[in-house]
């Protein structure tokens, strides 16, 4: 269970960071 929870936590963090970077690049392109 602990390994599964850690995996989902890492996956969620990676997804959040990727989304943040994508949004940042989109804003830079718009400017």
From Swiss-Prot:
Signal peptide: none annotated. InterPro entries: Cyt_b6/f_cplx_su6. It is found in: Plastid, Chloroplast thylakoid membrane. Belongs to the PetL family. One of its GO terms (biological process) is photosynthesis. The 4 large subunits of the cytochrome b6-f complex are cytochrome b6, subunit IV (17 kDa polypeptide, PetD), cytochrome f and the Rieske protein, while the 4 small subunits are PetG, PetL, PetM and PetN. The complex functions as a dimer. It comes from Phytolacca americana. This is Cytochrome b6-f complex subunit 6. Keywords: Chloroplast, Electron transport, Membrane, Photosynthesis, Plastid, Thylakoid, Transmembrane, Transmembrane helix, Transport. Component of the cytochrome b6-f complex, which mediates electron transfer between photosystem II (PSII) and photosystem I (PSI), cyclic electron flow around PSI, and state transitions. PetL is important for photoautotrophic growth as well as for electron transfer efficiency and stability of the cytochrome b6-f complex. The chain crosses the membrane at residues 4-26. It is a single-pass membrane protein. One of its GO terms (cellular component) is chloroplast thylakoid membrane.
């Amino acid at each position: 269970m602990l390994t599964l929870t850690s995996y989902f936590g890492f996956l969620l963090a990676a997804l959040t960071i990727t989304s943040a970077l994508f949004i940042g690049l989109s804003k830079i392109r718009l400017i």
